[in-house]
Amino acid sequence: MEDLFLISAITNCITYSYLHEFGLTQSNIIFNTGGGALLLLPKCDGYKERIEKVSDVVQAALLQMFNTDINYIYSFVECDAEELEQFKIDKAILLKSLLEEEKLRKFHKRIDEKFFYQSPDNTSVCIMCGSNFVKRDGEQCEVCDSITKLSDFFVKHEQMLLLYDFSGKFKKILHNCVCIDMHFMQMYLIDSEDISLYKQIVKSGYDYIETINHSCLGNTRWIANLVPLKDGNVLPFEDISEKLLSKEEYGDSKLGILKMDVDNLGAIFAFGLSKTRSLSKYLTLSRLMETFFGYHLIHICEKISRELISKVKENTDNENMFYINYAGGDDLVIIGPASGILLLAKEIDHSFYQYTNNKNINISGGITIMSPSKPIRLGIKEAEENLSASKKVKGKHAITLLDRTIKLERYEHVLEIVNVFKEYIDKKYISRTCFYNMMSILDVNNIEEYYHSIPLLMYMLKRNVLNERIRCELKKEIATKNTIEEVYELVVEMKLTIMQTRES
Protein backbone atom coordinates (compact mmCIF):
# COMPACT_ATOMS: atom_id res chain seq x y z
CA MET A 1 0.00 0.00 0.00
CA GLU A 2 2.71 2.45 1.07
CA ASP A 3 5.01 2.03 -1.95
CA LEU A 4 2.03 2.49 -4.26
CA PHE A 5 0.98 5.58 -2.28
CA LEU A 6 4.53 6.82 -2.80
CA ILE A 7 4.10 6.43 -6.57
CA SER A 8 0.78 8.28 -6.37
CA ALA A 9 2.41 11.08 -4.37
CA ILE A 10 5.26 11.30 -6.89
CA THR A 11 2.70 11.57 -9.71
CA ASN A 12 1.16 14.52 -7.85
CA CYS A 13 4.60 16.00 -7.27
CA ILE A 14 5.27 15.93 -11.03
CA THR A 15 1.88 17.51 -11.70
CA TYR A 16 2.36 20.31 -9.18
CA SER A 17 5.88 20.99 -10.48
CA TYR A 18 4.43 22.14 -13.80
CA LEU A 19 1.68 24.14 -12.09
CA HIS A 20 4.22 25.80 -9.82
CA GLU A 21 6.40 26.83 -12.77
CA PHE A 22 3.45 28.58 -14.42
CA GLY A 23 1.98 29.98 -11.19
CA LEU A 24 -1.22 27.98 -11.58
CA THR A 25 -3.65 26.44 -9.11
CA GLN A 26 -5.08 22.92 -8.84
CA SER A 27 -7.98 24.09 -11.00
CA ASN A 28 -5.74 23.57 -14.05
CA ILE A 29 -5.62 19.80 -13.43
CA ILE A 30 -8.07 18.08 -15.78
CA PHE A 31 -7.29 14.75 -14.17
CA ASN A 32 -4.50 13.32 -12.05
CA THR A 33 -4.98 9.70 -11.09
CA GLY A 34 -3.82 6.16 -11.77
CA GLY A 35 -0.23 7.20 -12.51
CA GLY A 36 -1.19 9.70 -15.22
CA ALA A 37 -2.23 13.33 -15.49
CA LEU A 38 -3.66 15.82 -17.95
CA LEU A 39 -2.96 19.51 -17.35
CA LEU A 40 -4.16 22.76 -18.86
CA LEU A 41 -1.18 25.12 -19.30
CA PRO A 42 -1.08 28.59 -20.91
CA LYS A 43 0.43 29.03 -24.37
CA CYS A 44 2.61 31.93 -23.31
CA ASP A 45 6.03 33.10 -24.51
CA GLY A 46 8.64 30.43 -23.88
CA TYR A 47 6.13 27.85 -22.63
CA LYS A 48 7.92 24.97 -24.39
CA GLU A 49 11.24 25.86 -22.79
CA ARG A 50 9.58 26.13 -19.36
CA ILE A 51 7.96 22.71 -19.76
CA GLU A 52 11.33 21.21 -20.74
CA LYS A 53 13.07 22.94 -17.82
CA VAL A 54 10.66 21.43 -15.27
CA SER A 55 10.87 18.04 -16.96
CA ASP A 56 14.68 18.02 -16.81
CA VAL A 57 14.69 18.83 -13.08
CA VAL A 58 12.03 16.25 -12.17
CA GLN A 59 13.41 13.45 -14.36
CA ALA A 60 16.94 13.99 -13.03
CA ALA A 61 15.68 13.80 -9.43
CA LEU A 62 13.72 10.61 -10.13
CA LEU A 63 16.72 9.00 -11.82
CA GLN A 64 18.95 9.90 -8.87
CA MET A 65 16.48 8.50 -6.31
CA PHE A 66 15.03 5.47 -8.09
CA ASN A 67 17.47 4.75 -10.93
CA THR A 68 15.25 3.62 -13.82
CA ASP A 69 12.54 2.02 -11.63
CA ILE A 70 10.35 5.15 -11.49
CA ASN A 71 10.26 7.80 -14.17
CA TYR A 72 7.77 9.34 -16.54
CA ILE A 73 7.27 10.63 -20.06
CA TYR A 74 5.34 13.69 -21.16
CA SER A 75 4.05 15.41 -24.26
CA PHE A 76 1.74 18.28 -25.14
CA VAL A 77 -0.50 19.59 -27.89
CA GLU A 78 -1.78 23.09 -28.60
CA CYS A 79 -5.53 23.83 -28.58
CA ASP A 80 -7.53 26.86 -29.59
CA ALA A 81 -10.62 27.97 -27.65
CA GLU A 82 -13.09 25.92 -29.70
CA GLU A 83 -11.00 22.73 -29.55
CA LEU A 84 -10.62 23.14 -25.81
CA GLU A 85 -14.31 23.83 -25.22
CA GLN A 86 -15.40 20.74 -27.18
CA PHE A 87 -12.38 18.67 -26.09
CA LYS A 88 -12.05 17.26 -29.59
CA ILE A 89 -11.25 13.58 -30.10
CA ASP A 90 -8.49 14.19 -32.65
CA LYS A 91 -6.52 16.19 -30.08
CA ALA A 92 -6.82 13.40 -27.52
CA ILE A 93 -5.70 10.82 -30.11
CA LEU A 94 -2.76 13.00 -31.18
CA LEU A 95 -1.65 13.46 -27.57
CA LYS A 96 -1.86 9.73 -26.93
CA SER A 97 0.19 8.93 -30.04
CA LEU A 98 2.86 11.44 -29.00
CA LEU A 99 3.05 9.81 -25.56
CA GLU A 100 3.44 6.37 -27.15
CA GLU A 101 6.39 7.71 -29.17
CA GLU A 102 7.98 9.10 -26.00
CA LYS A 103 7.69 5.72 -24.27
CA LEU A 104 10.10 4.30 -26.84
CA ARG A 105 12.79 6.84 -25.92
CA LYS A 106 11.99 7.86 -22.37
CA PHE A 107 15.61 8.11 -21.18
CA HIS A 108 17.12 9.59 -24.33
CA LYS A 109 17.82 12.97 -22.68
CA ARG A 110 19.38 11.36 -19.62
CA ILE A 111 21.79 8.97 -21.33
CA ASP A 112 25.43 9.92 -20.76
CA GLU A 113 28.66 8.11 -19.83
CA LYS A 114 27.34 7.49 -16.29
CA PHE A 115 23.90 6.18 -17.28
CA PHE A 116 24.87 2.50 -17.66
CA TYR A 117 27.67 2.33 -15.10
CA GLN A 118 28.71 4.50 -12.20
CA SER A 119 31.19 3.63 -9.46
CA PRO A 120 29.36 3.77 -6.10
CA ASP A 121 30.69 5.77 -3.17
CA ASN A 122 29.81 2.84 -0.87
CA THR A 123 29.87 -0.94 -1.28
CA SER A 124 27.04 -1.85 1.12
CA VAL A 125 23.56 -2.50 -0.28
CA CYS A 126 20.19 -1.54 1.25
CA ILE A 127 18.90 -4.37 3.45
CA MET A 128 15.32 -3.78 2.27
CA CYS A 129 15.41 -3.31 -1.52
CA GLY A 130 18.79 -4.87 -2.24
CA SER A 131 19.54 -2.40 -5.03
CA ASN A 132 20.47 1.03 -3.64
CA PHE A 133 23.83 1.60 -1.97
CA VAL A 134 24.15 2.64 1.70
CA LYS A 135 27.06 3.60 3.96
CA ARG A 136 27.04 0.52 6.20
CA ASP A 137 25.74 -3.06 6.09
CA GLY A 138 22.27 -3.49 7.57
CA GLU A 139 21.11 0.04 6.75
CA GLN A 140 18.13 1.11 4.66
CA CYS A 141 18.43 3.48 1.72
CA GLU A 142 16.65 6.83 1.68
CA VAL A 143 13.76 5.54 -0.45
CA CYS A 144 13.11 2.44 1.67
CA ASP A 145 13.36 4.54 4.82
CA SER A 146 10.59 6.78 3.44
CA ILE A 147 8.43 3.74 2.63
CA THR A 148 8.94 2.36 6.17
CA LYS A 149 7.92 5.69 7.71
CA LEU A 150 4.92 5.88 5.37
CA SER A 151 3.89 2.40 6.51
CA ASP A 152 4.06 3.34 10.19
CA PHE A 153 2.09 6.54 9.53
CA PHE A 154 -0.63 4.79 7.50
CA VAL A 155 -1.23 2.21 10.23
CA LYS A 156 -1.84 4.93 12.81
CA HIS A 157 -3.77 7.48 10.73
CA GLU A 158 -6.80 7.26 8.49
CA GLN A 159 -7.12 10.99 7.75
CA MET A 160 -4.15 13.17 6.89
CA LEU A 161 -2.81 16.16 4.98
CA LEU A 162 -0.23 15.94 2.19
CA LEU A 163 1.68 19.19 1.74
CA TYR A 164 3.87 19.96 -1.30
CA ASP A 165 6.62 22.46 -0.46
CA PHE A 166 8.62 24.01 -3.32
CA SER A 167 10.03 26.88 -1.25
CA GLY A 168 11.66 24.93 1.58
CA LYS A 169 10.04 27.11 4.25
CA PHE A 170 8.39 24.17 6.02
CA LYS A 171 11.61 22.27 6.83
CA LYS A 172 11.72 23.67 10.37
CA ILE A 173 7.98 23.72 11.02
CA LEU A 174 7.41 20.13 9.86
CA HIS A 175 10.75 18.59 10.86
CA ASN A 176 8.98 15.88 12.92
CA CYS A 177 6.59 14.88 10.10
CA VAL A 178 7.09 12.11 7.56
CA CYS A 179 8.95 13.71 4.66
CA ILE A 180 9.47 12.48 1.11
CA ASP A 181 12.47 14.52 -0.03
CA MET A 182 12.54 14.87 -3.82
CA HIS A 183 15.63 17.15 -3.57
CA PHE A 184 14.02 19.95 -5.60
CA MET A 185 10.95 19.94 -3.31
CA GLN A 186 9.57 18.13 -0.26
CA MET A 187 6.29 16.35 0.45
CA TYR A 188 5.06 16.11 4.06
CA LEU A 189 2.46 13.80 5.58
CA ILE A 190 0.69 15.53 8.46
CA ASP A 191 -1.76 14.25 11.07
CA SER A 192 -5.07 16.07 10.46
CA GLU A 193 -5.75 16.11 14.20
CA ASP A 194 -2.58 18.07 15.00
CA ILE A 195 -4.28 21.46 15.46
CA SER A 196 -1.03 23.29 16.23
CA LEU A 197 0.60 22.24 12.95
CA TYR A 198 -2.63 22.95 11.08
CA LYS A 199 -2.64 26.56 12.32
CA GLN A 200 1.04 27.05 11.44
CA ILE A 201 0.47 25.75 7.91
CA VAL A 202 -2.48 28.07 7.34
CA LYS A 203 -0.60 31.04 8.82
CA SER A 204 2.56 30.41 6.77
CA GLY A 205 0.77 29.86 3.48
CA TYR A 206 1.54 26.86 1.29
CA ASP A 207 2.19 26.03 -2.34
CA TYR A 208 -0.14 23.04 -2.71
CA ILE A 209 -1.91 20.83 -0.20
CA GLU A 210 -4.27 17.87 -0.34
CA THR A 211 -6.62 16.46 2.25
CA ILE A 212 -6.63 12.66 2.38
CA ASN A 213 -9.92 10.87 3.22
CA HIS A 214 -11.75 13.96 4.51
CA SER A 215 -12.41 17.55 3.46
CA CYS A 216 -10.31 20.32 4.94
CA LEU A 217 -7.69 22.14 2.83
CA GLY A 218 -6.94 22.04 -0.89
CA ASN A 219 -8.03 19.11 -3.04
CA THR A 220 -9.80 16.22 -1.35
CA ARG A 221 -8.45 12.80 -2.31
CA TRP A 222 -9.81 9.42 -1.30
CA ILE A 223 -7.28 6.67 -0.71
CA ALA A 224 -8.54 3.22 0.21
CA ASN A 225 -6.28 2.80 3.23
CA LEU A 226 -7.62 -0.42 4.74
CA VAL A 227 -5.73 -3.31 6.34
CA PRO A 228 -6.61 -5.86 9.06
CA LEU A 229 -5.26 -4.58 12.38
CA LYS A 230 -4.60 -6.35 15.67
CA ASP A 231 -3.21 -4.51 18.70
CA GLY A 232 -2.38 -1.57 16.43
CA ASN A 233 -0.30 -3.66 14.02
CA VAL A 234 -1.02 -4.98 10.53
CA LEU A 235 -1.84 -8.69 10.58
CA PRO A 236 0.74 -10.86 8.74
CA PHE A 237 -0.56 -12.62 5.63
CA GLU A 238 -0.28 -16.00 7.38
CA ASP A 239 -2.68 -14.78 10.08
CA ILE A 240 -5.02 -13.23 7.50
CA SER A 241 -5.40 -16.61 5.78
CA GLU A 242 -5.46 -18.80 8.90
CA LYS A 243 -7.17 -16.85 11.70
CA LEU A 244 -9.95 -14.77 10.16
CA LEU A 245 -12.16 -17.51 8.72
CA SER A 246 -13.27 -20.71 10.39
CA LYS A 247 -11.62 -23.80 8.87
CA GLU A 248 -14.80 -25.74 9.59
CA GLU A 249 -16.80 -23.30 7.44
CA TYR A 250 -14.25 -22.40 4.77
CA GLY A 251 -11.71 -25.22 4.57
CA ASP A 252 -8.10 -24.68 3.54
CA SER A 253 -6.18 -21.68 4.87
CA LYS A 254 -5.45 -20.15 1.49
CA LEU A 255 -4.71 -16.55 0.59
CA GLY A 256 -6.56 -14.87 -2.26
CA ILE A 257 -5.33 -11.97 -4.38
CA LEU A 258 -7.81 -10.01 -6.50
CA LYS A 259 -6.83 -7.60 -9.27
CA MET A 260 -9.56 -5.74 -11.16
CA ASP A 261 -9.84 -2.80 -13.50
CA VAL A 262 -12.42 -1.06 -15.66
CA ASP A 263 -12.86 -2.32 -19.22
CA ASN A 264 -12.07 0.06 -22.08
CA LEU A 265 -11.86 3.14 -19.86
CA GLY A 266 -9.45 4.84 -22.26
CA ALA A 267 -11.88 4.32 -25.13
CA ILE A 268 -14.75 5.58 -22.97
CA PHE A 269 -12.81 8.77 -22.25
CA ALA A 270 -11.81 9.18 -25.91
CA PHE A 271 -15.03 8.19 -27.68
CA GLY A 272 -17.76 7.63 -25.10
CA LEU A 273 -18.38 11.31 -24.47
CA SER A 274 -18.82 12.24 -28.12
CA LYS A 275 -22.12 14.11 -27.69
CA THR A 276 -21.49 17.62 -26.39
CA ARG A 277 -17.97 16.76 -25.24
CA SER A 278 -16.44 19.02 -22.61
CA LEU A 279 -13.62 19.15 -20.10
CA SER A 280 -16.12 19.10 -17.24
CA LYS A 281 -17.56 15.76 -18.38
CA TYR A 282 -14.07 14.31 -18.72
CA LEU A 283 -13.13 15.54 -15.27
CA THR A 284 -16.41 14.35 -13.71
CA LEU A 285 -15.97 10.81 -15.04
CA SER A 286 -12.37 10.72 -13.83
CA ARG A 287 -13.32 11.87 -10.32
CA LEU A 288 -16.26 9.49 -10.11
CA MET A 289 -13.91 6.59 -10.87
CA GLU A 290 -11.47 7.80 -8.25
CA THR A 291 -14.28 8.09 -5.69
CA PHE A 292 -15.42 4.51 -6.28
CA PHE A 293 -11.94 3.00 -5.98
CA GLY A 294 -10.74 5.31 -3.22
CA TYR A 295 -13.88 5.62 -1.06
CA HIS A 296 -16.68 3.14 -1.80
CA LEU A 297 -14.29 0.20 -2.02
CA ILE A 298 -13.55 0.42 1.70
CA HIS A 299 -17.23 0.02 2.57
CA ILE A 300 -17.57 -2.94 0.20
CA CYS A 301 -14.65 -4.69 1.95
CA GLU A 302 -16.14 -3.95 5.37
CA LYS A 303 -19.55 -5.26 4.26
CA ILE A 304 -18.15 -8.62 3.10
CA SER A 305 -16.04 -8.89 6.27
CA ARG A 306 -19.21 -8.54 8.37
CA GLU A 307 -21.30 -10.90 6.24
CA LEU A 308 -18.94 -13.88 6.34
CA ILE A 309 -19.22 -16.28 9.25
CA SER A 310 -15.80 -15.48 10.58
CA LYS A 311 -13.51 -14.88 13.52
CA VAL A 312 -12.81 -11.35 12.34
CA LYS A 313 -14.25 -9.66 15.47
CA GLU A 314 -12.07 -11.54 17.92
CA ASN A 315 -8.91 -11.46 15.80
CA THR A 316 -8.90 -7.86 14.50
CA ASP A 317 -9.34 -4.38 15.95
CA ASN A 318 -11.24 -3.00 12.95
CA GLU A 319 -13.42 -6.01 11.97
CA ASN A 320 -11.85 -6.16 8.52
CA MET A 321 -10.23 -9.12 6.77
CA PHE A 322 -8.97 -7.45 3.58
CA TYR A 323 -5.63 -5.82 2.83
CA ILE A 324 -6.06 -3.18 0.10
CA ASN A 325 -2.65 -3.24 -1.53
CA TYR A 326 -3.64 -0.64 -4.10
CA ALA A 327 -6.80 1.10 -5.27
CA GLY A 328 -6.86 4.16 -7.47
CA GLY A 329 -7.72 5.47 -10.89
CA ASP A 330 -9.62 2.54 -12.35
CA ASP A 331 -7.97 -0.53 -10.80
CA LEU A 332 -7.31 -2.32 -7.53
CA VAL A 333 -5.28 -5.06 -5.87
CA ILE A 334 -6.74 -6.62 -2.70
CA ILE A 335 -5.39 -9.47 -0.56
CA GLY A 336 -7.45 -11.53 1.88
CA PRO A 337 -8.64 -15.00 2.87
CA ALA A 338 -9.37 -16.90 -0.35
CA SER A 339 -13.06 -17.49 0.42
CA GLY A 340 -13.49 -13.82 1.25
CA ILE A 341 -11.79 -12.74 -1.98
CA LEU A 342 -14.16 -14.93 -4.02
CA LEU A 343 -17.19 -13.16 -2.55
CA LEU A 344 -15.53 -9.75 -2.68
CA ALA A 345 -15.03 -10.00 -6.45
CA LYS A 346 -18.76 -10.62 -6.92
CA GLU A 347 -19.71 -7.74 -4.61
CA ILE A 348 -17.34 -5.27 -6.29
CA ASP A 349 -18.80 -6.12 -9.71
CA HIS A 350 -22.35 -5.75 -8.38
CA SER A 351 -21.58 -2.47 -6.58
CA PHE A 352 -19.76 -1.06 -9.60
CA TYR A 353 -22.80 -1.68 -11.80
CA GLN A 354 -25.05 0.01 -9.22
CA TYR A 355 -22.60 2.92 -9.06
CA THR A 356 -22.41 3.51 -12.82
CA ASN A 357 -25.95 2.34 -13.70
CA ASN A 358 -24.54 1.76 -17.18
CA LYS A 359 -24.27 -1.70 -18.75
CA ASN A 360 -21.57 -0.40 -21.11
CA ILE A 361 -19.14 0.40 -18.28
CA ASN A 362 -17.90 -2.87 -16.82
CA ILE A 363 -15.08 -4.23 -14.73
CA SER A 364 -12.97 -7.38 -15.17
CA GLY A 365 -10.73 -9.26 -12.77
CA GLY A 366 -8.18 -11.94 -12.05
CA ILE A 367 -7.88 -14.02 -8.87
CA THR A 368 -4.90 -15.94 -7.52
CA ILE A 369 -5.39 -18.55 -4.79
CA MET A 370 -2.11 -19.38 -3.08
CA SER A 371 -0.31 -20.47 0.05
CA PRO A 372 0.34 -17.54 2.44
CA SER A 373 4.02 -18.55 2.55
CA LYS A 374 4.45 -17.85 -1.18
CA PRO A 375 5.92 -14.40 -2.01
CA ILE A 376 3.08 -11.90 -2.43
CA ARG A 377 4.72 -10.25 -5.43
CA LEU A 378 4.48 -13.54 -7.33
CA GLY A 379 0.81 -13.86 -6.41
CA ILE A 380 0.11 -10.31 -7.58
CA LYS A 381 1.92 -11.04 -10.84
CA GLU A 382 -0.22 -14.15 -11.36
CA ALA A 383 -3.40 -12.17 -10.61
CA GLU A 384 -2.28 -9.61 -13.18
CA GLU A 385 -1.77 -12.39 -15.75
CA ASN A 386 -5.24 -13.71 -14.95
CA LEU A 387 -6.67 -10.22 -15.43
CA SER A 388 -4.94 -10.06 -18.82
CA ALA A 389 -6.64 -13.35 -19.75
CA SER A 390 -10.01 -11.83 -18.80
CA LYS A 391 -9.28 -8.81 -21.00
CA LYS A 392 -8.92 -11.08 -24.04
CA VAL A 393 -12.54 -12.26 -23.81
CA LYS A 394 -14.93 -10.74 -26.32
CA GLY A 395 -16.94 -8.01 -24.60
CA LYS A 396 -14.79 -8.52 -21.47
CA HIS A 397 -16.67 -8.24 -18.10
CA ALA A 398 -14.95 -11.48 -17.11
CA ILE A 399 -12.96 -13.00 -14.28
CA THR A 400 -10.15 -15.56 -14.46
CA LEU A 401 -9.24 -17.99 -11.69
CA LEU A 402 -7.84 -21.51 -11.50
CA ASP A 403 -6.71 -21.21 -15.15
CA ARG A 404 -10.25 -20.64 -16.43
CA THR A 405 -12.08 -17.49 -17.52
CA ILE A 406 -15.75 -16.97 -16.64
CA LYS A 407 -18.04 -14.14 -17.67
CA LEU A 408 -19.01 -12.13 -14.59
CA GLU A 409 -22.67 -12.55 -15.51
CA ARG A 410 -22.13 -16.25 -14.66
CA TYR A 411 -19.84 -15.78 -11.68
CA GLU A 412 -22.58 -15.36 -9.07
CA HIS A 413 -24.19 -18.60 -10.31
CA VAL A 414 -20.81 -20.34 -9.96
CA LEU A 415 -20.57 -19.31 -6.29
CA GLU A 416 -24.16 -20.45 -5.69
CA ILE A 417 -23.35 -23.92 -7.07
CA VAL A 418 -20.23 -24.03 -4.89
CA ASN A 419 -22.41 -23.45 -1.82
CA VAL A 420 -24.73 -26.27 -2.91
CA PHE A 421 -21.80 -28.66 -3.37
CA LYS A 422 -20.35 -27.60 0.00
CA GLU A 423 -23.65 -28.45 1.68
CA TYR A 424 -23.63 -31.93 0.12
CA ILE A 425 -20.16 -32.60 1.53
CA ASP A 426 -20.79 -30.98 4.92
CA LYS A 427 -23.97 -33.05 5.39
CA LYS A 428 -22.12 -36.19 4.26
CA TYR A 429 -24.32 -36.88 1.24
CA ILE A 430 -21.06 -37.43 -0.63
CA SER A 431 -17.53 -37.79 0.69
CA ARG A 432 -14.96 -35.15 -0.10
CA THR A 433 -12.65 -37.85 -1.47
CA CYS A 434 -15.27 -39.14 -3.90
CA PHE A 435 -16.10 -35.58 -4.95
CA TYR A 436 -12.40 -34.89 -5.56
CA ASN A 437 -12.04 -38.03 -7.67
CA MET A 438 -15.03 -37.02 -9.80
CA MET A 439 -13.55 -33.55 -10.26
CA SER A 440 -10.26 -35.10 -11.43
CA ILE A 441 -12.11 -37.18 -14.02
CA LEU A 442 -13.99 -34.11 -15.26
CA ASP A 443 -10.82 -32.03 -15.67
CA VAL A 444 -10.66 -32.75 -19.42
CA ASN A 445 -9.37 -30.89 -22.47
CA ASN A 446 -12.25 -31.36 -24.91
CA ILE A 447 -15.95 -32.21 -25.02
CA GLU A 448 -15.35 -35.74 -26.37
CA GLU A 449 -13.33 -36.66 -23.29
CA TYR A 450 -16.17 -35.32 -21.16
CA TYR A 451 -18.76 -37.49 -22.94
CA HIS A 452 -16.54 -40.57 -22.49
CA SER A 453 -16.26 -39.89 -18.74
CA ILE A 454 -20.03 -39.75 -18.06
CA PRO A 455 -20.63 -43.53 -17.63
CA LEU A 456 -17.87 -43.76 -15.02
CA LEU A 457 -19.22 -40.70 -13.21
CA MET A 458 -22.74 -42.17 -13.13
CA TYR A 459 -21.34 -45.38 -11.70
CA MET A 460 -19.48 -43.47 -8.98
CA LEU A 461 -22.64 -41.57 -8.04
CA LYS A 462 -24.64 -44.79 -7.85
CA ARG A 463 -22.05 -46.40 -5.60
CA ASN A 464 -21.30 -43.45 -3.33
CA VAL A 465 -24.44 -41.27 -3.04
CA LEU A 466 -27.26 -43.08 -1.25
CA ASN A 467 -29.75 -40.20 -1.09
CA GLU A 468 -31.72 -40.44 -4.34
CA ARG A 469 -32.66 -36.74 -4.46
CA ILE A 470 -29.07 -35.61 -4.00
CA ARG A 471 -27.87 -38.18 -6.53
CA CYS A 472 -30.33 -36.82 -9.12
CA GLU A 473 -29.23 -33.26 -8.42
CA LEU A 474 -25.59 -34.20 -8.90
CA LYS A 475 -26.40 -36.05 -12.12
CA LYS A 476 -28.16 -32.93 -13.37
CA GLU A 477 -25.15 -30.74 -12.59
CA ILE A 478 -22.50 -33.14 -13.83
CA ALA A 479 -23.92 -34.98 -16.86
CA THR A 480 -25.81 -32.29 -18.79
CA LYS A 481 -23.06 -30.07 -20.18
CA ASN A 482 -23.16 -29.26 -23.90
CA THR A 483 -19.94 -27.27 -24.40
CA ILE A 484 -16.40 -27.54 -23.12
CA GLU A 485 -16.81 -24.05 -21.57
CA GLU A 486 -19.63 -25.40 -19.41
CA VAL A 487 -17.39 -28.29 -18.34
CA TYR A 488 -14.58 -25.87 -17.47
CA GLU A 489 -17.03 -23.87 -15.35
CA LEU A 490 -18.15 -27.05 -13.56
CA VAL A 491 -14.55 -28.00 -12.77
CA VAL A 492 -13.93 -24.52 -11.30
CA GLU A 493 -17.02 -24.97 -9.12
CA MET A 494 -15.77 -28.35 -7.92
CA LYS A 495 -12.22 -27.10 -7.25
CA LEU A 496 -13.57 -24.19 -5.20
CA THR A 497 -15.75 -26.64 -3.28
CA ILE A 498 -12.75 -28.84 -2.48
CA MET A 499 -10.81 -25.77 -1.33
CA GLN A 500 -13.60 -24.65 1.02
CA THR A 501 -14.36 -27.98 2.69
CA ARG A 502 -12.58 -30.40 5.00
CA GLU A 503 -12.68 -34.18 5.15
CA SER A 504 -14.77 -35.38 8.08
Predicted regions and their residues:
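Charged, helix-rich terminal subdomains or tails
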Residues: M1-S504
